[in-house]
């Protein structure tokens, strides 16, 4: 099975008791859940109690943290430029998440509509 890059929006829904547990939990159990570094930072930026923070960090510690080398960041810039040429302005964090999925040929779990718009221009495989 393919890896599953999980975007911040999908994590937030899942952690709140919603989202797609039928996709997230098997990916966690099978070591297919993939965590872009920016998603970890975004999740840890949220307001939470010290206990919630420890629980979140314990969960994230069990997820594969993706590495982003210099070439990856060049591809992120190229992706943003290509999308902008089609009139689609994408933030660097969202382009990074998309590029992580593209680099690995992984599926992307998200609830953010920007990724659907991106998928109309690049071969991004979204699961919902």
How does the language model describe each region?
Residues 64-109:
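Active-site neighborhoods of divalent-metal-dependent phosphate/nucleic-acid chemistry enzymes
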Residues 11-12, 40-43, 115-116:
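A generic structural signal for short hydrophobic patches within well-formed alpha-helices
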Residues 1-35, 45-58:
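Short, well-structured N-terminal submotif of metal-dependent ribonuclease cores
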Residues 32, 64, 123-125:
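Conserved beta-strand segments of alpha/beta enzyme cores
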Residues 50-54, 83-84, 125-128:
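Short, hinge-like loop/turn segments at secondary-structure boundaries
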Residues 6-7, 35-36, 89-92, 112, ...:
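Histidine- and aromatic-rich ligand-binding microenvironments
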Residues 21, 36, 40, 53-56, ...:
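A general structural signal for well-ordered alpha-helical segments in protein cores
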Residues 1-3, 98, 102-128:
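Acidic, PIN/NYN-like endoribonuclease modules and their adjacent C-terminal/linker elements
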């Amino acid at each position: 099975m393919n890896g599953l890059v999980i975007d911040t929006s999908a994590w937030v829904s899942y952690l709140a008791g919603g989202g797609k547990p039928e996709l997230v939990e098997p990916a966690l159990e099978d070591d297919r859940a993939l965590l872009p570094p920016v998603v970890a930072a975004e999740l840890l930026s949220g307001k939470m109690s010290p206990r919630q923070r420890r629980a979140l960090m314990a969960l994230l510690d069990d997820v594969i943290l993706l590495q982003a080398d210099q070439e990856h960041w060049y591809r992120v810039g190229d992706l943003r430029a290509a999308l902008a040429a089609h009139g689609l302005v994408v933030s660097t964090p969202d382009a990074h998440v998309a590029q992580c999925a593209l680099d690995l040929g992984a599926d992307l779990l998200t609830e953010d509509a920007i990724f659907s718009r991106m998928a109309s221009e690049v071969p991004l495989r979204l699961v919902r």
